Structure formats: C-alpha cells, structure tokens
A protein has these predicted regions:
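Helix-biased detector of long, well-ordered alpha-helical tracts
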Residues: 1-330
Length: 330
C-alpha cells in the first residue's frame, strides 16, 4: 500500500528513506550534480565566494503568497544578494515530523524547485531526517554565490547616502498573522527572490554602499543594526514609507507598527545622493520593485541612531525590536 504520511521508517536510512528521496526530492530537484548522489557536491567556481545558511520554521507551512519551500529558497538567495554576490548553488536539509502528508511535501518540493528556477540557482545537495511530531516540517538551506569584486556592507555607508526601500512594508508579517488569527483578509506575503533587482544595480554605474533584506524585526531593526555598524545616524521620513492601505488598516486593528513588521521580498539600499535617481529607476523597473521609494538619508550625527520624522513633524528614536514579536514568521 502506498504511504501517504511521513513515518519514523522514512528516517531510518533504509528502503523507506530511499523511496522518499527518489520519489519526492530527486524528482523535484533533478539536475546532473544532484543525480550523482554522493556525500558532497563538486561544482565549478572561481574567485571569491559568498556563503550563507538559514533555517525556516514558518507556521503555517502554506500561506497566502507562498509556503515554507518558496520562503526557504528566497531567504537564502536574498542573503547572498545583499553582499552583491551572484547566487549559484543551494543545499537543503529537511526535518520532517511524523504525520506530514506526502502530498504537502510534494507541493513544498515543487515550490522550492520553481523558486530556484526563478532565482537561477541549482539545488545540488540535501538531507532528510524524521522526528516524532504532529505533521510539521523544518527546512535549512545553505547558499553559495560568486562575489562580484565590490565591497558592499554597512561599513561602506557614508554620510549623505540616500536610503531606498524597494517596496511596501509588512506584507509577509501581516499575511502570516492573519492566517494564525483567522482574520479574513487578502493580504499576501511578498516572499520573492530579488535577483533581477540586485543584478540591475550591480551591472549599472550606480555605486551601492550597502543592501539589507528586511526580515524578522522589520525595517526598524535592520536599520538600527546598520546604523550601529556604520557609526552614523539614519533619518527617515514617516510620510515616505510605503505601506498599503490594507496593511495599514491591519496594523491599526491590532496595534502594530509597520516599521517592525517583517517582509520576505524587500530590501533597503544605501547609495550616494548622486546615484539615487538612477538606483530608484532601476529598482522600480525590475521584478518586485514597482513601489520602491526614497525613505531617508544618512548623516554624521550621533553614532548608531535611527530617527523618524513623524507625519505631524515630531521626531522619535527607533530601537531594535525588543521581546518576542511574532514567532515563526520565517
């Protein structure tokens, strides 16, 4: 009888494990490197490489705009991109809980394969383990990319730089929370690979000083971290922050601040003021960048400070997210 759920036998390393790998993962991620089924993948490469890893525990596994599979590819690909690297290879490790439906696992693997194709990366190695549980799933992905010979990071930020946000705040956070609270809304996660957007910047004459994708803790937290690393002050204009009316209403209903709400397909970019118009044009012309906006600038004020000029003309200091926030958002 064909099995329909994950059992402990699928983690034994025996016939059930082989059937699981061959029936789902090898089929979904099929490529010549993975097909060798050796203990490690040997891939071509030259020069400096970028390496990152991330783990994904999002609850629920499927949500409006994505699923844990798409998220696991986007998150790791975007981390490579934020250093200006060209993403190339991924590995993936799956922790499967007993009771997980095979059909759900197939959907997730297919989603990962489709997202990897969109991002231009190849899944070259993987692993599965099974634990007792209630039908859950956790994924770890590691990514390798090729550096492009440009130093990009928070330490490169300069006074006078302009801060560009690639799109609307808070959509992933709102999508996950609305699912958990059974709130009827059509807000969709912004989960997306930012390959086209970053490639457009990296192949242009724009000088990119820093990029950071906006995930847990939201824009406020990542800007605070970058301000502290750079030793500079970041000034934002609240009126310039892009937030959709639906997300703004959702925040008002639950008392949330869009600045602290996570995304999974947005980034903040710091460029010299002389390059801001061209950078903004390139981002808006790329996939997932239509709502990009200049939201602030960098100055040589108090080191590590992030200040928001409110809509009524006041000023408030921003700190990193304190406390739990929304657990298992990614």
């Amino acid at each position: 009888m064909e099995q329909t759920v994950i059992t402990t036998a699928h983690g034994s390393g025996g016939a059930a494990t082989a059937a699981l790998i061959d029936g789902i993962f090898a089929k979904a991620f099929d490529n010549p490197v993975l097909a060798q089924m050796e203990d490690s993948a040997v891939v071509p490469g030259a020069g400096e490489i970028a390496v990152t890893t991330d783990s994904f525990v999002v609850d629920p596994l499927f949500f409006n705009g994505g699923d844990i599979g798409r998220l696991s590819v986007c998150g790791t690909v975007n981390d490579l991109l934020m250093r200006g690297a060209e993403p190339k290879y991924l590995t993936c490790g799956f922790i499967l809980e007993t009771g997980l439906l095979f059909e759900e696992l197939k959907r997730i693997a297919a989603s990962m394969a489709a997202t990897a194709k969109e991002a231009g990366v190849t899944i070259v190695a993987g692993d599965t383990k099974v634990v007792e549980g209630g039908g859950g799933l956790y994924i770890n992905t590691a990514g390798v990319g090729f550096a492009q010979g440009r130093e990009i990071g928070a330490r490169q930020i300069q006074p006078g730089d302009v801060i560009i946000l690639s799109g609307n705040l808070g959509e992933h956070h709102a999508a996950i929370l609305s699912e958990r609270l059974s709130i009827d809304t059509d807000i969709a996660s912004d989960c997306a690979p930012l390959v086209e957007m970053v490639r457009a910047l990296m192949t242009s004459d724009v000088t990119v000083h820093a990029m950071r994708d906006i995930t847990r803790g939201g824009l406020a937290t990542i800007l605070k971290e970058m301000a502290e690393t750079s030793g500079l002050t970041f000034e934002l204009k609240e009126s310039c922050l892009p937030v959709t009316p639906k997300v703004r209403d959702f925040c008002g209903l639950l008392g949330l601040d869009p600045l602290y709400m996570g995304n999974e397909g947005k980034m903040a970019v710091m460029v010299p003021e002389s390059d801001a118009d061209e950078a903004l044009r390139l981002i808006r012309a790329s996939a997932y960048g239509a709502h990009a906006a200049v939201v602030g600038r960098v100055c040589a004020g108090e080191p590590g400070q992030v200040v928001v000029e409110t809509a009524v003309g006041g000023r408030r200091n921003i700190d990193v997210l304190r406390g739990e926030g929304l657990p298992r958002i990614c």
